[in-house]
Amino acid sequence: MMNKPQGYICASKDEHDHCVMELIDRQDGFCVGRLDKNTTGFLLISNDASLQKKLLHPLYHVEKTYYVETLKPLQHHLIDAFNQGIIIDQKIQCLPAVLSFIDDYHCYVTIYEGKYHQIKKMFLSCQNQVVKLHRVSFAGVELDSSLHEGEYRHLSQEEFQKMKDQYSF
């Protein structure tokens, strides 16, 4: 588990950008899913291709929860809209998502798929804009709050078992 910092891309090498793999000691791992360059938070890095395939397969609807800060105040009707599934890019129906308000500009969003820039596009479809996006949990495991940006640690046996149990691997 890594607390991905802003400004890094989810790749092993890139000529133009810093890569998260530069931050870890081992180079035999790869990112399980992606967070865009400006998104921070929980990034799973593994050397188990089978695990990666299962966690990313659309069949499993792996849960991902994000802390979101928006440009405009949040509207309460968005809770129902997210529960029904937002249409992004004028034609792509997202699976239902859970939106939980913190205050007028901050919320948590839980999604069960991983379309390209999905949460940002969901808010754009609702005439709002994401100004900060931070993944707080992945596959039922919460980001270790003691990890500073750029730091990582191995999953505990309990965390790994929780993922396996939740998604029947």
Feature-to-residue mapping (PLM):
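RNA pseudouridine synthases
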Residues: 1-169
